[in-house]
Swiss-Prot record:
Name this protein carries in UniProt: GMP reductase
InterPro entries: Aldolase_TIM, GMP_reductase, GuaC_type_2, IMP_DH/GMP_Rdtase_CS, IMP_DH_GMPRt
Function: Catalyzes the irreversible NADPH-dependent deamination of GMP to IMP. It functions in the conversion of nucleobase, nucleoside and nucleotide derivatives of G to A nucleotides, and in maintaining the intracellular balance of A and G nucleotides.
HAMAP family the UniProt entry points to: GMP_reduct_type2
Keywords, sorted A to Z: NADP, Oxidoreductase
An example molecular function term from Gene Ontology annotations: GMP reductase activity
Amino acid sequence: MENVFDYEDIQLIPAKCIVDSRSECDTSVTLGGHTFKLPVVPANMQTIIDENIAAWLAENGYFYIMHRFEPEKRLAFVQDMKARGLISSISVGVKENDYEFIRELKAQELVPDYITIDIAHGHSNAVISMIQFIKEHVPESFVIAGNVGTPEAVRELERAGADATKVGIGPGKVCITKIKTGFGTGGWQLAALRWCAKAASKPIIADGGIRTHGDIAKSIRFGASMVMIGSLFAGHEESPGQTIEIDGKLYKEYFGSASEFQKGEKKNVEGKKMHVEHKGSLQDTLVEMEQDLQSSISYAGGNTLEAIRNVDYVIVKNSIFNGDRF
């Protein structure tokens, strides 16, 4: 690999502005035949999304992916979203009960709009088999497969039938894969995204390592169609985690999908738990993200997300905050 860098190492270079107001800039993105207000999706984690948040996001024009940690509820969830005329977007693993679930979907002629195959190391025979199984049983579903961190993985999952791939091995705030295993894209996630996107012929979803709204624009610049975000979406009024008070301040729980809090056991743990400050309403965060991304588009010299893909950039190792940590 040539240059290795991460989000805080990159600054995008402005181009001549062509809009009178940032409100003229369109942040929408199309994925799998549906158009969404933002190229952003809350992480499919138990402390980030639940049925209520999924329905609210769908009703308001945002993409979502429901988590896979209550498998017994998945069928009813798809039925409910269909009944309400909303997009259905669910996650599966690669275990026998996941295969059973896909068979059940076919038997009931239920076709989720999106199915995300979601395991920590997605470049695997198990994921390839599941992609092929889904495409055989519910071929109309848009299949997102991951997570991966190499061009070879992207090509192989696309060849197997994936409609999009999710890039990121352990760069998230509550993920400790890099510490526990020595592997992953933590610390060079943005370079890994660029590397993978160059090999991709289908959409890429960047997953993990996003710490600021500017990182969304950087992900778009380096090839992401959609950006999955955990920690920035944790801690909202609507978030599923428990609210607790520490020294007079309100916090919410946020834990990784491979943490012992998620698994209920200390076995193959690659995630941790943290408390994030209570952030108010999810809608306020989404509006702020949209406004910041509109500003990014205006700096990129265009009026759609496409403009961001064409800007120049510089690598400024670890210096863009100049001591200012938000």
